[in-house]
Amino acid sequence: LLALVCTEARQERIEIGNRISENLPEIPAELIESLNQYQNTRGAGFAGWTTDGCLLISTRFAETAQAHRVCQPMGMREQLTFYKEPVGGILPSPANAWRPGFVFSKDKGGDEFSQLYWFDYPSRTTTLLTDGKRSQNGGTVLNEDGSLMAYSSTARNGTDRDIWLRDTKTGQS
C-alpha cells in the first residue's frame, strides 16, 4: 500500500528548445483557427490627405509597407506603390500644390541609402528626386504650393547631414 502512495504519477514532458512543458493538454485545432483572425491583422499608418480628399496611408502586406489611399468612409484600400522594398516617409502634396502626388523614401535591397521619389497621381509614375547614390535622404517638407521641397541628405560627403532645397518645378537643388 505504501508503494502505491509513493509511486510518482507519470508526467508527460515535452522539450522544445529551452522550453519544458509538463502535463499540458494539446491545444484544439479549432482554437488555433479562431485565434488566427485576431493574430493575423494589418496595421495602417496615417500619412496625410491627398489633394482630392482621399486618406493616404502606409499599410504593411507580407514583409513590406506600401502606400495606399482610401477615398471614402469604409472604402477599399487602393495600393499605389508596388515595390519589394518598403516605402516610408510618405508626404502628400499640400492642398494648394501645383501638382497632385506624394513624396516617399525607399532604399534598395536593405542598403539603408534611402532615396526620395515623387509619385504622380494622374500618370501613376514615380520619379527619383535625389542623387540615387550612396546617400541617406529624408525629413522632407514641402512649402504651401509644393513648389519647394526641403530635405536632409548625406550626399555631400556620405556622413554629415545637410539641408537641401529643391525646386520641384525645375528639378534644381
Predicted regions and their residues:
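Residue-level signal for WD-repeat beta-propeller blades
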Residues: 49-50, 61, 71, 96, ...
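Multi-bladed beta-propeller domains
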Residues: 11-43, 70-88, 109, 119-136, ...
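Generic alpha-helical hydrophobic packing signal
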Residues: 67, 148-150, 165-167
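Short, solvent-exposed loop/turn segments at conserved positions within beta-propeller repeat blades
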Residues: 60-65, 108-114, 155-161
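Conserved beta-propeller blade repeats
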Residues: 39-58, 84-106, 116, 133-152, ...
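Bacterial Sec-dependent signal peptides at the C-terminal "C-region" and cleavage site
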Residues: 2-12
